[in-house]
Amino acid sequence: MHFIYRFSQGLRLRQVDMLQEGITGSSSTLTKLAYRLRGVCKSAIKRMRRRGDLKIGKRHEIVFIDESKFGHKRKYNRGRQSNRASWVFGMLGVKEEFRRPILKVVNQRSAQHLMPILQKHVRQGSTVVSDGWRAYNGLRDAGYNHLTVNHKEVFVDPQTGAHTQNIERLWGVCKATVWRCRRNRTESRLKDHLKVIEWTYWRGDVHKNGPLGMILHDIRRKYPV
């Protein structure tokens, strides 16, 4: 239960710490537990997507979009320095104090790759804020109210007040979370971590009993007795 609590709260999952604290006597047990809990989060997010609940925008919810590169770490920091990295496309719905991210690993940052993802998850007619990346030039024609910020000149547009600080903060949270979760060695593992982050914002933070209450609820859904 202590491990489940730490996982649901996004706390650091270093095996050496938990072994020293007596949470478990085996590192392999911890690895299996983490794998199972990531699976629980992924299943919960997939259920939401099948129901059509994983959408953002409209009704006073502004959507911030951006891309960020996540480098893959070498195991034990050995071997050649790896240049492998994955681009992640982030869409963040912001309404009052609520933050709801959708995070997708993408092969390219072109309009051809990004626009279909955005149109699938962001409701048409929404206000979308981005930087000046050319892949977003067609947003207005696609039915969105598009605001841009030219970071080469300003961080906040003086006329519209548009900025990208919300999603920049999200990237900081995402990368810190991936770092705590024993690094990000493959694209597949990165996708798992991103699903856990989505779960935290969409489910863990809104349950009346907090993230622990929601992870226990989702465990029962995935592994009914």
Model-flagged regions — what are they?
Residues M1-V225:
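Residue-level recognition of single "structural anchor" positions
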